[in-house]
Amino acid sequence: MEGIIAWWARNPVAANLLMAGIMLGGVLGFISMEREAFPGFNIKQVQIEVIWPGAAPQEVEEQVVMRIEEALTDLDSVRRISATASEGYGRVDVAAYSYVDINAFVNDVKNRVDAVNGLPRDIEKPQVKRTEYRDEMIRVALHGNVSEKALTRLAQDLRDQIAALPYVSIVNLYGTRREEVTVELSEASMRSFGVSFAEVAQAIRSSSINLSSGQVRTATGDIRLRARNLADSQADFENIIVRQTAGGATVRVGDLATVVDGFEENKILTTMNGQPAVLLDLLATDNMQVVKASEAVKTWLAQTRPTLPQGVNLTLWFDTAEIYKSRMSTIGDSAYMGLLLVFLVLILSLRPKVALWVTAGIAVAFIGTFSLLPANDVSLNVMSTFAFLLVLGIVVDDAIVVGESIHLHAQRHGGGTEAAIAGASAVSKPVIFAVITTMIAFAPWFFLDVEGGHMTEQFSIVITVALTISLIEAFLILPAHLRHLKPRENLRGLSLWQRRIEHSIMHFADTYYRRILHWTARRRYLTSSIFIGAFIVSVGIFSAGWVKFSFFPEIQNQQIYINVMLPNGTPYSRSLEVLDQLQRAELQLIEEVGSGSTGESEKLIQGWYARASRDSVIAIVRLTPQEQRTMSAREVAQRLQDLVGDIPDADEIEVNYTINRRGPAITYMLRHRDMGMLRAASGELQSKLRSYEGAYYVRDSLRGESDEIHLKLLPGATRLGINLAQVSQQVRQAYYGEEVQRLPRENGDVKVMVKYPRALRESNSSLNDYRVRTADGRELPMLSVVASEVNNGVQRIQRRDVDRMVSVTAEADVDQARDIYTELER
């Protein structure tokens, strides 16, 4: 090592070029780094989605999910298989080990799924793709008192405009419904004309078409033959001929049905500050530049607002660039203050030149670290910059130890290049081994094979690179800069004060510290016992919960999310009642704060976004900046929870006021093949959780039970020329509907559904009047050929590694959640 140090110390030009190269690489790396508030959640997982319209959860589980699981169980590199079966939908998530090539894994899974035999005929083609978790970057709200269709079409146009902006590519819409053309057949009209449901559906399929029929090759050129009769409006569908009699009379769709060119039936109410609204969510991209993306969006907003229709406005609702800039400003100020303090402390006992070059060496080490981070997939975010602060002390120690050693040798041996070489060489072994042990301490984070391991991996990369660059700077560059040190003579001014401070420190070390050191060395067993005892006491204090620990401490957001999941089949009116309950809590909170502090109510909440559908209610409360309010986000969230109270029929209630939290505070997963045993275990665990004072919103993932009407063919029905498959098909057509085609429109395909009127489909009594048609055209009351029985069914089935699974969740404060976990595991 001494030879390497000597060469660089004797070649200062090379040392300076090395320093310049490190700094240049650092600057270029800093410029090219991705910038985001928090690192992306990278996971090697494949998701398989299957849509089976109208199917019950048990059917989806048995005929779709289990067959896909069976095909994937023996696939190499599969770490975990999770699945969910709900009404009309099945999803299988296949997680791979961290060392697996994800692209090859996706292809392997896709090949296995494509080879599965026996899947139901009427399912949509399984969609296989890599799971991607993308954080929200910016959220823009489009709101105004206009019709739903006008607001949706405008939002779709604006989405395309935003997606074309630089540093933006993924934009999702929330608060909209899919467009749908519905042909609502009248049972009375079909009976009067003698037309069946299937006849109408087939007429639309065969008449509403665009079809290429080849071409005529003439002497003057080819002429294409095309049938262009695709219906695309209400009038087009109403004019489709269903039947034409021998006398020339025609029966058209308009004679039998009401055509509605609107939206799918799932009602949804989306508002912002009381106005109809649509949210445009800008998601994180692969090359994240959150600040530049924010600037581009703000410029676009300023240009677009004047062009909007009257009464419609765009509001920047959420911007992670503000969080990023705030955190970076705090960390940057801490770094600058730290370097200044290091310089001031060093200059108390070391020469200004030594203090300056040592401080500069620390800065060079940190700047140089940026040169290697982009190549290691590390972005500039709160986590990576915190790693810089974490390693700051060790980097400072390296530079100070080497610089002080060179300074000491210059004082004792006359200075010059040889003193610089000797000083650096004298401490090379302890410094290098200290750095290596630190690298080893953080090395396990490289190999964490867990979800989210990419986040902790950034700590190890930053620390390892920073320490490596600091060693290069301390032993290859710093000696060349301090080779001109000479022994100080004729001390005066600052030099005299530095000598006095140095003598004071040495006097303390030679007297008080030396005495303590000798005393402890002579009583080594007592000394060891004291430190072992202190260690045991420290562990005990931590284990008892007196000292709280959180690997990822909560970072409060400027928004509070309230998410209420209701059972499938919940009436839309009930969702509106829950939404009203949340809004009343908000108004009561504003009133409370306003009565306690004059004018404070206007400063607490900036806006309120709400979305209600049949099975979920979401509210987002936007708070004013922290410096403009007296209550923290946590206090506001806790008070809102108290004011809202419990919602007994809700399957899940979540109130989140942090940026970096995902999911409930407490989660337990129970696995077994017997659903009855899972229900019993879940109930027992929920009762236990409810006994803790700090736990609330205790739920499981079963989402209660739903009523089902089971149909069974009566004896003798087959003699009438009818079977259960025919009855089921006709009932499905009547109550679920039949998709006859999809219309290509500007913003995506639009389903064309043939079904019975909504009023009929929302009444149980309609089953008593429903008639099924036999193959020879006869109509029979449905209940004359089938028996109906009401049974209980599940709303959702979760599976993990071929077993059924139930998740039990609860909300609690971070500290209370840890205590509850600890007590339950005893």
Please provide the spans of the model-predicted regions:
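Surface-exposed amphipathic alpha-helical segments in non-transmembrane regions
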Residues: 16, 23-32, 63-80, 93-179, ...
